[in-house]
């Protein structure tokens, strides 16, 4: 399965119904919630990302969020960018935590590891490059040891069908962990990364993707098969600006990834490529 066949289901109306919310999540492995985050807080984080790209010489200082562009994702110091984006303050804001606890139905702990993404459009590029994106994978393959965390992905500016985002294989979490093999088409830090072969994602596990607005959340199970969709926006030409973290019940064990900022992992020269990407020590490369 490689092509998107449908939209996420809007689960926002289920927030007041514990049984219905949990039932949908158990069956489909994700929740798509619209306009549940403080949009002013989201815009503040988006502006911080813009300011970081400007400060590092990658973007026009006069560009608005809608006009912003950079030459390439890889031309920007990924570790340095984390100094500009105050994501921990956003995730742990009382209004954000309230939403997380509505989802879980209990107190939560937000991982100290956050990934930020700022992908320019490749539409019309003579030599488009998508190898920094992620192939089909499951976060639970690399992050643990407990698997009761959920990945929370948010756009910082609007996304369209063309500007990319996350494609989910509906219900794929129910088959548990799958084999991940090296994929030379996707590389980070100069090395190929592991992913799930598309042939291992069933036709019955329909691939879903929808446009999103600031204030929306896409969250999914540790075993959800998902992948990046490239940014090919051209009318308008938009950056894909987003960030994601993991959240788990406060009572659960807190593993390495939960307690270690991504930047600390990335700076550790002793770690292999997947450890740098996920923040989790691993022998699997």
Curated annotation (Swiss-Prot):
**Listed cofactors:** Fe cation; L-ascorbate
Keywords per UniProt: Antibiotic biosynthesis, Dioxygenase, Iron, Metal-binding, Oxidoreductase, Vitamin C
Q: Give the EC number(s) under which this enzyme is classified.
A: 1.14.11.35
Check the record and name the Pfam families matching this protein: PhyH
| Binding annotation for Fe cation | 137, 139, 226
Which residues are listed for substrate binding in this entry?
A: 117, 188
Which pathway does UniProt place it in?
Antibiotic biosynthesis; neopentalenolactone biosynthesis
InterPro entries to which the protein is assigned, alphabetical: DxPntBtaHylase (IPR054971), Phytyl_CoA_dOase-like (IPR008775)
Q: What catalytic activity is recorded?
A: 1-deoxypentalenate + 2-oxoglutarate + O2 = 1-deoxy-11beta-hydroxypentalenate + succinate + CO2
> Could you say which residues bind 2-oxoglutarate here?
137-139, 153, 228, 240
The pH note for this entry is: Optimum pH is 6.0.
Query: What GO terms are given for molecular function?
Result: 2-oxoglutarate-dependent dioxygenase activity; iron ion binding; L-ascorbic acid binding
Q: Which EC class, in a word?
A: oxidoreductase
SUPFAM superfamilies in alphabetical order? Clavaminate synthase-like
Example GO biological process: antibiotic biosynthetic process
Question: Which family does the similarity line name?
Answer: Belongs to the PhyH family.
Protein's job? Catalyzes the conversion of 1-deoxypentalenic acid to 11-beta-hydroxy-1-deoxypentalenic acid in the biosynthesis of neopentalenolactone antibiotic.
- General remark: S.avermitilis does not produce pentalenolactone itself in vivo but instead a group of new metabolites that are neopentalenolactone derivatives.
List the NCBIfam families hit by this protein, alphabetically: DxPntBtaHylase
The name under which this protein is listed is 1-deoxypentalenic acid 11-beta-hydroxylase
Give the organism, scientific name: Streptomyces avermitilis (strain ATCC 31267 / DSM 46492 / JCM 5070 / NBRC 14893 / NCIMB 12804 / NRRL 8165 / MA-4680)
């Amino acid at each position: 399965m490689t092509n998107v066949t449908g939209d996420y289901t809007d689960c926002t109306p289920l927030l007041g119904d514990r049984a219905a919310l949990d039932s949908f999540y158990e069956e489909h492995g994700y929740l798509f919630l619209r306009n549940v985050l403080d949009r002013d807080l989201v815009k503040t984080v988006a502006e911080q990302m813009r300011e970081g790209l400007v400060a590092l010489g990658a973007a026009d200082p006069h560009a608005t969020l809608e006009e912003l562009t950079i030459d390439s994702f890889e031309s920007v110091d990924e570790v340095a960018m984390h100094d500009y984006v105050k994501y921990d303050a956003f995730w742990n804001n009382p209004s954000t935590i309230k939403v997380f606890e509505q989802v879980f139905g209990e107190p939560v702990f937000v991982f100290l590891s956050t990934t930020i993404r700022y992908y320019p459009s490749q539409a019309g590029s003579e030599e488009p490059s998508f190898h920094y994106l992620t192939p089909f994978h499951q976060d639970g393959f690399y992050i643990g040891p407990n698997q009761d965390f959920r990945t929370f992905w948010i756009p910082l500016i609007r996304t369209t069908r063309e500007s990319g985002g996350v494609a989910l294989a509906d219900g794929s979490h129910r088959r548990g962990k799958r084999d991940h093999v090296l994929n030379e088409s996707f590389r980070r830090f100069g090395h190929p990364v592991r992913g799930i072969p598309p042939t291992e994602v069933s036709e019955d596990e329909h691939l879903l993707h929808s446009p999103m607005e600031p204030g929306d959340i896409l969250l999914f199970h540790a075993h959800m098969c998902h992948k990046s969709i490239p940014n090919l926006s051209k009318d308008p030409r938009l950056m894909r600006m987003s960030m994601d973290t993991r959240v788990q019940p406060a009572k659960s064990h807190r593993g390495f990834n939960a307690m270690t900022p991504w930047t600390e992992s990335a700076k550790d020269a002793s770690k292999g490529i997947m450890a740098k990407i996920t923040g989790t020590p691993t022998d699997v490369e």
